[in-house]
Amino acid sequence: MRNIQEHPGFYVVGITARTNNAQEMSGNGKIGDVWQTFLQPSLVAKIPNKIGVDPIAVYTDYETDHTGHYTYLLGLPASPVEALPANLTVKHIPAGRYAVFSSDRGPLEQVVPEIWQRIWSMSPEELGGMRSFKTDFEIYDQRAADPENAQIDVYVGLH
C-alpha cells in the first residue's frame, strides 16, 4: 500500500557533504563521517532556533538522479535562520507530495541502505508518481533511538 503525503515546507540546519551512492556503497563514503560529527553534543548545541530533537537527513541538490552526486545534510528542524555558526548550513525542504516508506527494523547501517535499494528499484507506478530528485529526507525519530534495532521513515519527493 502506497503512502503519499502532502508535506508542508520546513527548514533543517546541520552539516553537509557532497557525495554519491556508488561512493557510499563502496565503503569510502562521507555519510558516516557526517554522522560522527553531528553526534557531538557541542555541534547540536550550536544549531540555532531548533524546533525538534529528531535528526533529519536530507538528500538535495541532485546532479541527475540517484546515480549522480547529491548534497547530504544531517541536522535538526529549525525555524528560519539568518545567521549561522561556521560549518552549519540551512536548507529549506519544499512543500509538496512525498511517497513515505518505513524501513524494516534492525541495525541502522543495514536498514537504511536496504530501504533505499528498494526505492531505487521501484517504478513510478510503485512509487506513486515520478521522483522529482529535488529533495528527499529521512526522519530518525524515537524508533531509531537504538541504532541496533532501528526503524526510519524515508520521504521521497514526487512531481
Regions found by a protein language model. Give the residues of each.
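A solvent-exposed interaction/effector surface
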Residues: M1-H159
